[in-house]
Amino acid sequence: MAKKQSILSPIIRITFTFLVLCGLVYPLIVTGIAQAVMKDNADGSLIYNDKNEVIGSKLIGQNFTDPRYFHGRVSSIEYKAEASGSNNYAPSNPDLEKRVEKSIEEWKKQNPSVPVTEVPIDLVTNSGSGLDPDISPKAASVQVERISKLTNIPKETLDQLIKDQTEGAALGLFGETRVNVLKLNLGLQKIMK
């Protein structure tokens, strides 16, 4: 019995010590450093409106359906962050073909003057997470005609807005040139006022 206690005592102490270190101390230190060094990112990269209300995050896409606004990528999870993921259909899967065809049909309804051959792939396919907040500058540009027609904003103004909101690859190496759809639509709202 004494031998069992002598073996269990250090096991319990080590377990408790690591529980406190890994479950409490380490997360608090990392959170403190993140808040001090990069507060915006640590808080979720939130985007605020003119009234200082949170309206979204630059990291999570939103579903814009109003034809006067720029639309983002298709989301098989309807932009529900708790359900992040995609169907990940293989290119040979008939369900993928049906879903892309449906996206193309919706595109044609809203953008009848833009040939389907000019539609960038990111407007009719899912991202891996289903929550991608960004589109390519070309994906934004092909929507300019529709938005200009519905809002009476000159195409040149919309082209400049896209140019102003375009972000390059991180460190010039990682990722693609992209436009955040939420930021783009906030800029569009300011122009419409």
Swiss-Prot record:
Pfam families assigned: KdpC
Record's keyword terms, sorted: ATP-binding, Cell membrane, Ion transport, Membrane, Nucleotide-binding, Potassium, Potassium transport, Transmembrane, Transmembrane helix, Transport
Subcellular location: Cell membrane
GO CC, one annotated term: plasma membrane
Residues annotated as transmembrane: 14-34
Source domain of life: Bacteria
Gene Ontology molecular function terms on file: ATP binding; P-type potassium transmembrane transporter activity
Mode of membrane association: Single-pass membrane protein
Reported function: Part of the high-affinity ATP-driven potassium transport (or Kdp) system, which catalyzes the hydrolysis of ATP coupled with the electrogenic transport of potassium into the cytoplasm. This subunit acts as a catalytic chaperone that increases the ATP-binding affinity of the ATP-hydrolyzing subunit KdpB by the formation of a transient KdpB/KdpC/ATP ternary complex.
Subunit structure: The system is composed of three essential subunits: KdpA, KdpB and KdpC.
Protein family membership: Belongs to the KdpC family.
Protein name: Potassium-transporting ATPase KdpC subunit
